[in-house]
């Protein structure tokens, strides 16, 4: 179950990163229709939202992986201690 959740998190994170990278690209052959005004923010809010969402997904995935690794090492350490106690 944990492996499938990890895979799903990785796939979603990569998908969001790809979408945010593609959202910033302009189609080839089409020039900018709007002139650049120094006073206006030319960056749309939707790709920024996707960028933040992708960053959160990646941070959560890394936190999940690290938490899983510490749990598995704690489990192995406790398993070794139980094995020592049972042999006494």
Curated annotation (Swiss-Prot):
Keywords: Secreted, Signal
Start-end of Basic and acidic residues biased regions: 25-40
Residue span of region Disordered: 25-45
Subcellular location: Secreted
Signal peptide: 1-23
GO CC terms of this entry: extracellular region
Pfam families: DUF4576
Protein name per its UniProtKB record: Uncharacterized protein C5orf46 homolog
Organism: Bos taurus
């Amino acid at each position: 179950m944990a492996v499938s959740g990890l895979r799903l998190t990785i796939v979603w994170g990569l998908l969001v990163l790809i979408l945010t990278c593609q959202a910033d690209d302009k189609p080839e052959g089409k020039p900018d229709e709007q002139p650049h005004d120094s006073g206006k923010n030319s960056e749309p809010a939707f790709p920024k939202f996707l960028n933040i969402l992708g960053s959160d997904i990646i941070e959560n995935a890394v936190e999940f992986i690290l938490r899983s690794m510490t749990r598995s090492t704690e489990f192995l350490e406790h398993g070794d201690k139980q094995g020592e106690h049972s042999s006494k």
